[in-house]
Amino acid sequence: MKIQPKSGREATEAFLQGAGDVLLSYENEALFIERQGDPVEHVTPPHTFKIENPAAVLTKSENAEKAKAFNDFLYTPQAQRLWAEAGFRPVDATVAAEFSADFLQPEKLWTIADLGGWKQVDSALFAKDVGSIAKIYDAATG
């Protein structure tokens, strides 16, 4: 069966319904299904990618002050605990220590910068017909 889920959550749901033997997904998805009691084994590889979830405030927002306050709140210990409870790795060191059992530390967290930046990664992996992942995807679905 060939499927192309549109999101991490959709991929998780398809996996739990029997599509595939292994799911490569985001850490928060693994924690979500573990916390739901689904029969899965969550593996943190020794070398993996750091995926950041940025927030932005529009410079011309009519609610710029409130938006900035909300953005600032996201990094408070209170908000970081909420993020951690939802399965997202906290960036606050104190909160990270509180949730250390949930968020194992891999030997190496690669960043896009480690791989030459988005322009290089996008070309090498996703460029139509020549990117490594594009070719694998085309072979699997073509």
Question: Which residues does each predicted region cover?
Answer:
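Arginine residue identity/basic-tract feature
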Residues: 6-9, 35, 50, 81, ...
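Extracellular/periplasmic juxtamembrane helices and adjacent flexible linkers that interface
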Residues: 61-142
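Periplasmic-binding protein-like
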Residues: 5, 36-64, 68, 95-99
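Residue-level signal for functionally critical sites in structured catalytic/ligand-binding pockets
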Residues: 27-29, 51-54, 80
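Ligand-binding pocket segment of bilobal, Venus flytrap-like solute-binding proteins
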Residues: 1-45
